[in-house]
Amino acid sequence: MKMVYLGLFLIITSCVISSGNLIYECKWADSIRLKDKNPTHEFCKKKCEEKNTDRITVQHGFHSSDYRCTCQGEKILETPYQSDGVKDCHRI
């Protein structure tokens, strides 16, 4: 009986180890507070691209208030579990 349990344990462990991380493409939005008033859309897009690197695509960067830029786009997220804050995403 112990051999059966050991065999099941090894099979389950190997499946978990081999599954690895899941990869998701997610929509994201962020904002950047600035020192200068009334930034242009071009300035905001540049700031969004500078701030958001590492597997992130900036689709829009625009002036949203007197001292703030809003950034939107997509990012690639690798996670072992779907419950790790994965929202507004689809698996790729």
Curated annotation (Swiss-Prot):
Entry's Gene Ontology cellular component terms: extracellular region
GO MF annotation list: potassium channel regulator activity; toxin activity
PTM comment: Contains 3 disulfide bonds.
Localization annotation: Secreted
Tissue specificity field: Expressed by the venom gland.
Residues making up the signal peptide according to the UniProt record: 1-20
Keyword Transcription regulation listed: no
Top-level taxonomic group: Eukaryota
Main location: secreted
Keywords: Disulfide bond, Ion channel impairing toxin, Potassium channel impairing toxin, Secreted, Signal, Toxin, Voltage-gated potassium channel impairing toxin
Role of this protein: Inhibits voltage-gated potassium channels (Kv) (IC(50)=about 10 nM), when tested on DRG neurons.
Family: Belongs to the scoloptoxin-15 family.
UniProt name for this protein: Kappa-scoloptoxin(15)-Ssd2a
Annotated source species: Scolopendra dehaani
